[in-house]
Amino acid sequence: MVFRSLIRTFAPIMMKYLLDLTVKAVERIHERYVLIRLTDGKPLPEMVPGQFVEVRVDGSPSTFLRRPISINFVDRELNELWLLVATVGDGTRKLADLKAGDTLNCLLPLGNGFTAAKQGEKVLLIGGGVGVAPLLYMGAEMQDKGIEPTFLLGARTAKDLLLLDIFKRYGRAFVTTEDGSEGEKGFVTNHSILQNERFDRISTCGPTPMMKAVARFAKEKGIECEASLENLMACGLGACLCCVEKVKTSIDQTTPDPSYSGGETTNVCVCKDGPVFDVKRLLW
């Protein structure tokens, strides 16, 4: 019997759900990554690109805390939730061992999301490593609205590019690799599309050095930019304070955000107030 309950949290924007989801498939897409497809007997809750899930890892004494994982994709027709998992520790390795038919307890959806694209807006989605995960869902949602997304994906080598064929289904996909084995050689900020085309907004997720470089580029070009931070998280609700990040109280320091007070900077919980932030608020 599926256990379903509503969770009231500090984040009032969307209701949170505690669900026992059924594993539909686990696909090894890379030596360090698996794609977990989950389903439920009832329609999955509303989720927006950029939000994440806290999953409970059962059967492992060293994984008391839940693991935060970005929402990779939501297939409404098949009623599936996709999670792209990097196997970096005991907890995520345990998740990679799940089999079809197993149950995974999930708290979702958590955090905020990327700014929804508007008609006529040209949006560039830049990702690296497992940070490409939330951008797939973002691109799919844009396509559903008749807006063509542009993806710029970076990796060390061609074999490290994740889900590239699926990204190509939802928009234009450009690639950089550090060794030049696929796409243009170098980092995402070196790609020629940044010089050849003009974008209204950039959404990015991936390694912090990459996102900082993207933020610098956006500032130089006067492009709106938001980044999804990957701080260590535990509760996902803003209670444990382990994901705190110091940010500016406002974007321009002249019109303070009324939600905060007490100076030019403030501490926020990435899990509750983020993970997506306007880069002008970040102390980068």
Task: Please identify what each model-predicted range represents.
Residues 5, 9-10:
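Short, positively charged and aromatic/hydrophobic N-terminal segments
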Residues 249-263:
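Intrinsically disordered, low-complexity terminal tails and inter-domain linkers enriched
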Residues 208, 230-249, 264-275:
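Local cysteine-cluster metal-coordination motifs and their immediate loop/turn environment
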Residues 90-234:
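FNR/FR-type flavoprotein reductase catalytic core
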Residues 15-100:
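Ferredoxin-reductase
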Residues 58-60, 109, 248:
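Short, surface-exposed secondary-structure boundary micro-motifs
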